Amino acid sequence: MWDYIGDYGLAVAHPLYILIGQIFLFLPTGDMAFRLNFASGVGMSIALANIAVLAFQLTGRQWIGIATALMLSVMHTVWWLSTIAEVYTWNAAFMTGELLLLIHLIRAPKWQAAVALAFLNGLNWSVHNLALLALPVYVVVLIVLVKKRKLPAWALAASAAGFVSGSALYIIMIVFLALKKGDLWRAISSALFGRYTSKVLNVQTSWHFLKHNTALGLLNFVNFSVPLAVIGWFGMKRCLGGFLAAALIAITVIHFGFVTRYPVPDQFTFLLPSLVMIMLAASVGVSVLAERSKKWRIAVIFACAVSVIMPPIIYAKTPKIIELTGIKVKRERQRPYRDEIRYWVIPWKHNERSAEQFAEAALKQALPNGIIISDLTAYYPLVLVQQRDNTTAPEVSVKLLDTNEKPGRKNILLDRSVFVVLPDLKFLAPDIMARVEIRREKEEVLYSVKWTNP
């Protein structure tokens, strides 16, 4: 159980996503990394299929459903997250399923739909805490339907039971942590915030990460999605009815409001739910324009086609354009082999091997029996490559950064060659770190640790 919880709190445990990933590990092709990356693509495929159905249900036109899914599929964040092992695409898969049930519940209120919606939202909570952002809207919808006597009052209790059933895996982990730590509130806080309470509850925009995340986020909108969405929002009440329009707009505002003030390095990845909601509004906008006249219908079809064709071309050309303009993009921590612009701007990753190249070179440098002290970013590539090529560097030890000095560690480090992936990693007590020299030769990828006064 503790392997699922980890050291960063329940909020980043994602237990159902881990179970989904374990299922994909049974695939008979590719290595572990390929299978888990493939799982992200499958999750996004489910979400896109749901989006097509959602847009069809909102507009009554199949071609709008297909066009909406295609436009969303080539958005930068969507494509980027579909190629790497991350949790967000599966959150989108469950979220779009929830939206299908929400529309059904509002248009044809039945207690079964309410329970199914709550159950699916509970499952999604076991995937990612982003599921909780739409929960207040669902609760308000249920209360309104009960107040209007379109649902029986006991449907609220049944829905609550459905949510608890869906989130049973996560709730079990909360109970386990509470019993282990002897503190229920600490377990609940871990489930809701993990170690990121100040960031989750942040009420202002952080400029530290805003610059590059804004640039990456804007790549999602090199199309006609925003003007189509604006038209859709203005026409949503007329096309969908005030109740459904209010619910969809409320979910959009909550998700977009959350991501704009969530100060984390990968802030742009949290845009995915907002992009889903924006494209649903865009589908309504397409319908509004298509209804005006034949000329408008042709024009909006052309806009949809451009929105599918142009983004990949822009992604491919952007690194070259940045190079020609002389703009320098550097990180505080430079990673060997990684072209930062190519890594972040181009969403397809089938030919991006910087992590693999680094791991191969690092393990070779640490031969025959060195110790590599790694941060979290480099740790898993090192371990995966070592497991894959188990005859290359079997005696090399890869250690995740641990700032807690342990008895005997200094003596072990004195007996073996020691390397760090970054020069600022503090892996020993300050008084001992002051007595080591960390340097890297020109052709090396790791920094060697040399004791100046053993």
Where are these regions (language model features)?
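Hydrophobic, aromatic-rich transmembrane alpha-helices
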Residues: 219-242
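Perimembrane helix-loop-helix junctions
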Residues: 104-107, 133-164
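Membrane-interface transmembrane helices that cradle and orient dolichyl/undecaprenyl
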Residues: 56-62, 98-114, 123-124, 148
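Transmembrane-helix motifs of polytopic, lipid-linked glycan transferases
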Residues: 38-59, 97-101, 233-234, 280-284
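Membrane-interface alpha helices of multi-pass inner-membrane proteins
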Residues: 68-70, 113-128, 136-140
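Signature aromatic-anchored transmembrane alpha helix within multi-pass, membrane-resident enzymes
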Residues: 238-241, 286-328
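Transmembrane-helix signature of polytopic, membrane-embedded enzymes
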Residues: 46, 51-74, 93, 112, ...
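Short acidic/glycine- and proline-prone juxtamembrane loop motifs at membrane-interface regions
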Residues: 80-88
